[in-house]
Each structure stands twice: as structure tokens, then as C-alpha cells.
Amino acid sequence: MQNISRAAAIVGVAEADEIGYLENRKSDLQLNEEACYNAIEDAGLNKSDVDGLFAAGNTLGLAEHMGIHPKFTDSTSVGGSSFVIHAGHALAAIAAGYCEVALVTHGMAGHSRRFFEGSRESGAANSPGAQFESPYGFIGAPINYSMACARYMHEFGEDRSREAMAEVAISTAQVGRPQPQSTHPRPKGGDTADHVL
């Protein structure tokens, strides 16, 4: 198998103009578009250079809204890790010659959406999730992550895995907290596995 790890480089990184709890309502599309334009600018490119688009939503709608014409799109959606998977997919697409400049984006108006009455977006009432998952409380990221944790604990043992998962939470918080956009202050109990557990 060919090693493609050096087939591409990340040359631009950016966020939407506002993140966290927004004063004004913005859609997922607006946040994606802002982040895309900011990343393109950070890379020193033009939107016409982009020929690959990777997003966990409607890539064709985003491309149309931005006025770009990608040769390759990927809308794989696996929840909050989609953009991580898209980075790998973008690398593979570039190595295979499907595109030269890949734009990976993720934008979600989750925090700001809560503050606007009647703005809660939901799936169609006849979707499988609405019919067979939501009535039983199977909703959102906590459920999805807990399934992965349960599997990890089954494979590697409950005692060892609880502490390992606490360390992941601690290291994630330590990296994220110093960022200017962080919405999570330092916990009162400190960054210890005992406090997390």
C-alpha cells in the first residue's frame, strides 16, 4: 500500500467570524461559508482555486452558495468527528488526483440556535430517527459518544478505560481552554481524573 501521508499539506485554517453564543442568528450554512472564506484567505488562495469540498452537510448547496465548482465532493456524516474523517478523505482524494485544493469545513449553529424561540431545527417527522430513536431518548452527541465509550470499555476493561477517557477529557480541555473563543472556564476541581470521574 502506498504511503500518501506527504501527498498534501494543510495551508489554511480558520473559523467563522463569530463562534460560541452568537448575538445574531446565523445558519449552519452561514457559519460554514464564513469559515470557508476565512480559510481560503488564510491559505492565500482564491475561491476559484478550490476544486474539492468536504462537509458533513449539503456540499453541493454550500458550493452553489459560495459560487465554487468542485470536481470532487464528500458529504460523509459521522457526527462530531466528520471533519476529522474529511481531512483523511481530502488527503486520499488529492493523492488520487481527484482534486488539487480541498476545502474541509464544519459549521453548526447549535449554541446560538438555542436562544431564538421557535428556531430549533429538527428532522422530518417521518425520518427514521424521529420515528425509532427519539421516542426512546436516543438523541444527540451524548448518546453517540456513550456508545463508543461502552464499546471501548467492553474491549479494554472498565477500570482502565474510565481513567483513559478522563485523560482524554482533561487533555482536550487543556488544549481548548487557552483559546480566545473557549466557552469553558477552568473547573473548580482542577484538571484531575478524580474530578472528571
PLM region descriptions:
Residues 1-29, 131, 155, 167-171:
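Condensing-enzyme catalytic core mediating Claisen C-C bond formation in acyl metabolism
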Residues 2, 45-47, 69-197:
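Acyl-thioester C-C bond-transforming condensing/cleaving domain
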Residues 32, 59, 83:
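Conserved donor sugar-nucleotide recognition element shared by glycan-biosynthetic enzymes
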Residues 56-60, 108-109:
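Short glycine-enriched loops at secondary-structure junctions
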Residues 62-69:
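Glycine-rich loop at the start of a catalytic domain that most often binds anionic cofactors/ligands
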